[in-house]
Amino acid sequence: MMPSSFGAIDQPVSRIKEESLMSAPAVPDRFTTLPDEHALQATVVALEEHGFSVEVVDDLDAARQAVLARIPEGSSVMTNTSVTLAETGIADAIDHGGDRWESARNKMFALDFATQGQEMKAIAGQPDYALGSVHAVTRDGTLVIASASGSQLASYAWGAANVIFVVGAQKLVPGLAAAHERIYQHSLPLEDVRAQAAYGQHSQVGKVLEIHQELPGRIHIVLIRQSVGF
């Protein structure tokens, strides 16, 4: 698929993240500060009240183990472009870990976007499991995800049978205003640097998805007690 940044369906981030972040702009500490235990637990309760299931883990290894344990063998799995999925090793485990799961990403990129673009979109948009992260989680239980192209948003909102979000606890914010501040003042500047290193182009906020409510059982959140991702 044509390159498009900010969590869109494109190339893996692990190869260029270290190089790109060497020139990343400074961002306010409030966007990377971990919440206290009271705020974390209050957010978990709010998320559960809105139909999301949540588990809290201590580190990146535990997050990877938690995610992989939830995915039945043979499932089609789309690893949407995510610094968090790269840092936890989840993307590599799915896309380069053998034949335990069907990598929707690998299947998609075996096709030609110029002649098979719609088929590629169908593969990415309707997997058994869509994996990714979010840019903010509000205290009252809303998930906020920004994207340049919106290519991953369809699977999150409707297309995927199951969705698993892996989220660093630093992304917890008081409300929607703070969520949008975090996107524009923190996530976008960092993603812009990454996009220039990966694709030679700037990023942008083209679309923003807010998930306020979900039918129980479809969206699972693995919340990490560490700062990870943008």
What is each model feature region?
Residues 124-230:
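Conserved phosphate- and dinucleotide-binding cores of soluble alpha/beta proteins
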Residues 15-45:
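Short, compositionally biased "basic patch" segments
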Residues 1-19:
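N-terminal amphipathic/basic-hydrophobic helices that include classical n-h-c signal peptides
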Residues 6, 23-32, 51-57, 79-84, ...:
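Phosphate-binding glycine-rich loops and adjacent basic patches that engage nucleotide phosphates
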Residues 30-31, 53, 106-109, 163-170:
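Flexible, glycine/proline-enriched loop segments at strand-loop-helix junctions
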Residues 15-25, 74, 104-113, 167:
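Short N-terminal helix-initiation segments at or just after the protein's N-terminus
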Residues 36-121, 126-131:
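N-terminal active-site beta-alpha-beta segment that forms phosphate/nucleotide-binding
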Residues 25, 71, 159:
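Catalytic cofactor-binding cores of redox enzymes
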